[in-house]
Amino acid sequence: MTAATDSSPAVPPPAAARAAVAPAGGSPLVTTDYLGYRLASHFQPIYSLTHHRAVGHEALLRATSIATDVPVPPMELFASVDGDDARLSLDCASLRQHLAAYAGKDADEWLFLNVHPRSLASPVGPGIGEIAAALAAHDLRPEQVVIEVLESTLPDDADFDRRIDELRELGCLVSLDDFGAGHSNFDRVFRLRPEIVKLDRSVVVRAEVDAHARRIASQMVSLLHECGCLVLMEGIETDEGAYTALRCDVDFVPGWHFGRPAPALAGGAGLHALRAAWDRFDRQSATDDRLWQEQMSPYKQSIELASVLLAGGASIDEACRRFLSHPGSDMCYLLDKQGRQVVGNAFRDVVAHQQLESVQRFAPLRDTGQARWSRRAYFRGAAASPNIAQVTRPYMTLQGSRMCFTVSIQFDMGGRTLVLCGDASL
């Protein structure tokens, strides 16, 4: 790639990448001298939780002042150059450095490259031909390269969108970086159609300690999967973070817990941590599943009994008495085959009824006389498996500000198909 400012005397071009003297027994380190700094590359391994191995490495810039031999953080380095053209030139120089340092490495892995969106949006930025030539010069196929763009700095710019399309046509993959931080929104996912979305480290930090945040993270991952994206969770630095990533069903994980960035590729370093995370996940999943089944069994048995009693002519209050005796149970209701309620609710007791009715913030949702619940998982699950009790995942009920689960069963009563539902608060 040729920097946009190579022909400008104000921004001198970087020197070509060169092999520096390596430590004893090591391979030569490829570096680039640029405006008084020595640029080098470190590679952070990225693991597939499913494949149980490294599937790529992210190239991270390291810089040292040539005059003082003092390391300079990348953000400080970029802040030290004046003007967009200079930053564009530095961005291009770092890309060239990473390609040169990665050349000859494992062709079956991805190379993740950070590119500032302004570099791609700039009409004088590296064109698709220059990128293709730079890859070819280092014997790298476009399919090996994942171009990472920072989600928080994406421009609403036709030139940027065109460059993204050109990169994809060339064969590169596109990754949306730091999703879930700041003003993240799914419009950028819809617009750019990235193959990979990287969740910001703040997502895993919250999900590690907050069950509510963990549920949101899991649903975010599920939605991104449905959008056609693979999901990477950044910032895995602890056992708990690795376990959280597995629980949230993410695809890829980097992070110091699995391996620190280094000049050489070290994809095997994190396999022990990966095995440990899977061992914990397997043990905890088995325990959680057993406890959940034990906890739900009385509710399922009671809703099945209630359906038999209803079919035999009992009132909903009488039929659901046993279900409503269980801890957390709030109410039962009966739906027709279109999801409409056919009789009034059966409440656990007067107190439960009053508590549900007292949530004034949700008073506009209280009247369900014309409601249809056929879209809900508890209705669809029951309809798919008649006469077998179903249990939903926890969700926010429209009947008030609370999390609950619903137990449901479809059955026939006098020639009518009905679905009996029972809600219980968590």
Language-model features, listed with the residues they occupy:
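Sensory/regulatory domains in signal-transduction proteins
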Residues: F43-L49, A54-I66, N114-P123, H183, ...
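A short, polar/charged loop-to-alpha-helix boundary motif
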Residues: A63-V81, R260, A264-A266, R348-A371
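Extracellular/periplasmic ligand-sensing ectodomains of membrane signal-transduction proteins
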Residues: M331-S385
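Short, small/polar residue-rich loop motifs at catalytic or cofactor-binding pockets
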Residues: L39-S41, H326-S329, C404-F405
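EAL-family c-di-GMP phosphodiesterase catalytic domain
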Residues: M1-R38, H42-V55, R62-D69, V149-L154, ...
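Extracytoplasmic/periplasmic sensory segments of membrane signal-transduction proteins
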Residues: M296-V351
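Catalytic core of bacterial c-di-GMP phosphodiesterases, primarily the EAL and HD-GYP domains
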Residues: R87-D159
